[in-house]
Design a protein with these regions (language model features):
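Class I SAM-dependent methyltransferase SAM/SAH-binding core
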Residues: 44-46, 52-100
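Conserved catalytic/acceptor-binding region of the Class I
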Residues: 130-214
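Conserved class I S-adenosyl-L-methionine
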Residues: 1-40
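A short acidic, Gly/Pro-enriched loop at the edge of an enzyme's catalytic core
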Residues: 102-110
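A short, conserved alpha-helix within the catalytic core of class I
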Residues: 120-129
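Residues lining the SAM
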Residues: 113-117, 142-144
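Conserved Class I S-adenosyl-L-methionine
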Residues: 186-275
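A structural alpha-helix within SAM-dependent methyltransferase catalytic domains
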Residues: 34, 57-60, 130
Length: 275
């Protein structure tokens, strides 16, 4: 099978579901990065593959200007709306693929990638971002899983979401191979990101671990949004069968919830910092 290539339908229809279905980054992540990086409310942040601004807006108080870049126009519209609702006035949004940078955006003290670098041409993007970092600037990659929590036998205040059954339902509609845009994305060996970064001239990395084990209360609606926030089960993939899938998903969740609610134990968040 040919190698997967990006196309603009990757997250088609997912933007509105993302901030509802994904667990928000905790305030501790922003505080931890503030302390680790010495952020003081000055300078510029570039958030690459920003989606609906989940990390961009969390870090906005620690910079004079934050710039979110994403290839998906709908994601940027949601991000701009969230910034407006939160009264955040120092955020800018630009539609662009990471591979198209720098795009006359200028230099940045910090460049972040939150759950996004794996979608990109990593050697190309690493090299281009290197030229966008101001002297002393740093690259920060946030590794997290926010659509679902940890599996485990430990008891929680409410039942865990039936993720195995959810995955099986998605596979029944879309097939067993993970969908991604107009193609499929096969599981395989991941690129050695440390080798890529060092080849591009970066030094490091330093690591910061934040959170983990917190209990998150989640509703049926949040779980439905979580499924639709994923590229592998984005709404457009279901075509005319979308209403049928959503009805089955809702029935599955309603029948296993405790009065419409679930509990999940959050995963830790790792940040990898290069300079």
């Amino acid at each position: 099978m040919s190698e997967w290539t990006w196309d603009e339908s990757l997250y088609a229809g997912s933007a509105a579901h993302y901030p509802v279905g994904r667990m928000a980054y905790p305030e501790a992540l922003g505080v931890g990065l503030r302390d680790e990086l010495g952020l003081d409310g000055q300078g510029r942040l570039l958030d690459v593959g920003c989606g609906p601004g989940s990390l961009t807006l969390l870090l906005a108080p620690y910079f004079a200007t934050v710039v979110g870049v994403d290839a998906d126009a709908d994601m940027l519209a949601v991000a701009a709306g969230r910034a407006s609702d939160a009264g955040i006035g120092n955020a800018e949004w630009h539609q662009s693929r990471a591979e198209e940078l720098p795009g006359e955006l200028g230099a940045f003290q910090i460049v972040t990638f939150a759950q996004s670098f794996h979608w990109m041409d990593q050697p190309l993007v690493a090299a281009r971002i290197r030229g966008m970092l101001a002297p002393g600037g740093r690259w920060v990659q946030v590794r997290a899983t926010t659509h679902r929590g940890l599996d485990g036998p430990d008891e929680l205040p409410r039942p865990r979401p039936p993720w195995d059954a959810i995955d099986a339902l998605v596979a029944r509609y879309l097939g067993p191979v993970r969908r991604a845009g107009q193609g499929v994305r096969l599981n395989g060996a991941l690129p050695d990101e440390e080798e890529i970064m060092k080849a591009a001239g970066y030094e490091g990395p330093d690591r910061l671990i934040v959170g983990g084990d917190e209990i998150e209360d989640r509703t049926v609606e949040q779980l439905i949004a979580s499924v639709f926030s994923l590229s592998s089960s984005a709404p457009h993939l279901f075509g005319t069968r979308l209403p049928d899938f959503e009805a089955e998903l809702r029935e599955l969740l309603t029948s296993t919830a405790d009065h419409g609610r679930f509990a999940e134990r959050r995963r830790e968040i790792e940040t990898v910092i290069w300079h």
